[in-house]
């Protein structure tokens, strides 16, 4: 097959000259045809000629909705690697957006330790990095990838935001949230490594990642990793305290490990502890969080908490739900009844996809940031009372109209 040098160059004698003319000159027709192609195919045909390249750019600009790829127990159990890596490799061929930022979460047991390590600690760590690297390589080079591993995963199956979300407390699972570049919205990863020799946070470090001196800041997803190490939890609280008193939504928790952060120039140290996350800035963003404390212990009280979240009146189109729960909740907490909190969320938010994890501590409280940016609290919670255990944080993030 000869390479195509230009739309106007057609060397095949069987090609209809009228079709050649249309596809070489009529941008409206070309653009209409290209709207049916996934992003990977669009990038391939963009090299055909200048007209097609411009049409591809316009088509990609219209694809601004967040997309997700998920892998649950149905996809698990194969020997050729973690299910999330396999499913992402398959599904990226059909994704219609060009991912600019990716947030993925996977279960720590199988993502970190795919092979029996037989007490050889170093072998287990090497496997972890190889799995993460394989996943990172699937995304475009310019894409910002942040990945964490946790004891359990909350995921919505692919296909529709109205699919029943699954609380997978044990087992091979994961998801990847794909954020395109959205006009008027900036998503920035941040990372602060705990250095025993220097625990001071410089103001410029926070400013560079949009956490300070940023009037557009609306939401911060924040995760402490390896918090079982000495001083790690205190460091997490120190970092969060630098921006927690602002009128923003703050949600997250403590996870096992940081597995990917492609914005970092240096290789990740799986033995290190620190704080990582994403900041969301833009006046179009609306968000809310609710805290399900230890008093929430059955379906009725879980649904009451979702009613508080519903009362925030956050638009549900182009909105993502997050659930950050303690490993002590879930099936056993609700007297051998599974999926209670995820089902309660689905009852009140029938079309919003839900993602998250079961972790080792939760960060957040009842807060609402509305369109006119008024901070409200649904009940009396002190500003500094953001760190919890045996609780669940439910969050909504609305990224504005996708049009």
UniProtKB/Swiss-Prot annotation:
Ranges of residues in domain F-box: 21-67
Q: Where in the cell is it found?
A: Cytoplasm; Nucleus; Cytoplasm, Myofibril, Sarcomere, Z line
Subcellular location, principal: cytoplasm
| Substitution effect: residue 127 to A | Loss of EIF2AK4-induced cytoplasmic retention of FBXO22
Do you know which SMART domains this protein is assigned to?
FIST_C (SM01204)
- Would you kindly state one Gene Ontology biological process term found in this protein's UniProt entry? protein modification process
Record key words, sorted? Acetylation, Cytoplasm, Nucleus, Phosphoprotein, Ubl conjugation pathway
Looking at the keywords, is Phosphoprotein present? yes
Post-translational modification N6-acetyllysine, affected residues: 194
User: What CDD domains is this protein classified in?
Assistant: F-box_FBXO22
Q: Which residues carry this modification: Phosphothreonine?
A: 127
PTM details? Phosphorylated by EIF2AK4 at Thr-127 causes cytoplasmic retention of FBXO22.
The UniProt entry's GO CC annotations, sorted and at most eight, read:
cytosol; nucleus; Z disc
Task: Explain the purpose of this protein.
Answer: Substrate-recognition component of the SCF (SKP1-CUL1-F-box protein)-type E3 ubiquitin ligase complex that is implicated in the control of various cellular processes such as cell cycle control, transcriptional regulation, DNA damage repair, and apoptosis. Promotes the proteasome-dependent degradation of key sarcomeric proteins, such as alpha-actinin (ACTN2) and filamin-C (FLNC), essential for maintenance of normal contractile function. Acts as a key regulator of histone methylation marks namely H3K9 and H3K36 methylation through the regulation of histone demethylase KDM4A protein levels.
Q: Which PANTHER family match?
A: F-BOX ONLY PROTEIN 22
Q: How does it assemble?
A: Directly interacts with SKP1 and CUL1. Interacts (via C-terminal) with KDM4A. Interacts with TP53. Interacts with MTOR; this interaction promotes 'lys-27'-linked ubiquitination of MTOR.
What is the protein named? F-box only protein 22
